[in-house]
Amino acid sequence: GVISKPFFALSDTVLQVFCCRFADRIGKGIRGAPRDALIATVTPKDVMGASFGLRQSLDSAGAFIGPAIAALLMWLTFDNYRLIFWCALIPGLICLSLIIFEVKAPEPKNAHRTNPISREAMGRLSSAFWMLIAAAAVFSLARFSNAFIVLRAANVGISAAMVPLVMVLMNAVFAFSSYPFGKAADRIHPIWLLTLGIVFLFASQVTLALASSPVWVLAAVVLWGLHLGATQGIFSVFIAKLAPEDLRGTAFG
């Protein structure tokens, strides 16, 4: 992810930008599972929900603070895209330095390493885990791209200049709700929070379908952010609790 940022700034063609974006997404795919497995390993079980909620909250905060800073820099630099990508390299380097020099991963309890994707290893993942994965897959089918929310906002009369703020609102609600929902998962069964998240999703979709004014679209966006806050971190909590410790990376992947 960090390596791709300078190449974005140096790109001159659509193909080059596509390759940079592809590399950036590969980086995101590689880092996601180890990050969550590390969080699950170093976090006490009684605050697992709060830990994943905080992680999701900070991630979501970056999703709206970063674009907001980029928009400000674009305005100050008269749309200097290359400078924006060079600036985007700075937080990535800071993060990489923290991981290399400050984050200390605990040594595995079992020194004997086995193939985590073997049939034997997969058999150690419980039926409850596979039911969770199936539920997550079905849940994903009920969701649509955020791009459709933006299109719906424009469709009901929100101006082009204000449309990006729709996503800022959604990510803000997502960020501020993730930690409280995660903390709640340490006190009540996470299944109730997942159920609440599905209710929020259903309410948001119905509101978007029936909305006839910007106010209703914004209400739907708030509900969408709440559904993300009530579900994204909670799925991680479930996986951390259901997967054997030495297979958490595989389970999160």
Question: Can you annotate each of these PLM segments?
Answer:
Residues G1-P6, L89, W192-T207:
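Structural signature of the two symmetry-related core transmembrane helices
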Residues G53-A68:
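Glycine-rich segments within core transmembrane alpha-helices of 12-TM secondary carriers
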